[in-house]
């Protein structure tokens, strides 16, 4: 509310912006910049098209889905420290019986990364420190549990043998919420960072 940040909060937000800045030309919004630029269109039109792509729940909107899914989990699981209860919820999630009934554990899986998303690994180390500072270690522990169990359950149910890992979206929304950034600003913050990459392309 007073618009001031602790040194750790500033470092975490800075890291978030850096991690979202660029990620190759294969992601949806960066690919969109290639397509629109190839027609000879101007920079403003290219950025507008990239923003439209980023808005989708499978791209820039994924952080919001993770946060909403975790809220739903807390609402529907009596004891979030009970791994059996969390596992049962995640199974119901994949069976399209919970949350938005899409059969997805949001923030899990990536088109390229199977062992780990290096951006998520960097983010996770800062997330723990911030959670400790903000008195949200319990929430961080729940995210850890969902990460661990989610990998197992997806691999078992979907027969994914190459492995599955959390992506950068998994912890991003949690970090933004600890920084008191509203959900409505999650995707615009992503865009602020990613415009650097779009411009480079």
What are these regions (language model features)?
Residues 1-201:
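Non-transmembrane, aqueous-exposed alpha-helical and coiled segments at domain scale
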């Amino acid at each position: 509310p007073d618009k001031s940040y602790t040194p750790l909060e500033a470092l975490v937000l800075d890291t978030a912006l850096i991690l979202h800045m660029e990620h190759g030309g294969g992601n949806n919004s960066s690919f969109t910049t290639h397509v629109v630029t190839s027609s000879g269109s101007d920079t403003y039109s290219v950025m507008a098209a990239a923003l439209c792509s980023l808005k989708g729940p499978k791209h820039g909107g994924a952080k919001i889905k993770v946060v909403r899914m975790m809220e739903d989990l807390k609402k529907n699981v009596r004891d979030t420290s009970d791994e059996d209860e969390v596992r049962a919820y995640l199974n119901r999630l994949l069976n399209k019986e919970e949350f938005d009934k899409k059969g997805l554990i949001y923030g899990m899986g990536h088109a390229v990364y199977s062992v780990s998303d290096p951006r998520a690994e960097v983010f996770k180390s800062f997330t723990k420190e911030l959670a400790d500072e903000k008195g949200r270690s319990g929430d961080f522990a729940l995210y850890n549990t969902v990460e661990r169990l989610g990998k197992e359950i997806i691999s078992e149910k979907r027969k994914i043998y190459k492995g599955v890992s959390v992506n950068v979206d998994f912890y991003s929304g949690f970090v933004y919420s600890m920084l008191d950034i509203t959900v409505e600003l999650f995707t615009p913050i992503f865009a602020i960072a990613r415009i650097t990459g779009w411009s480079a392309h």
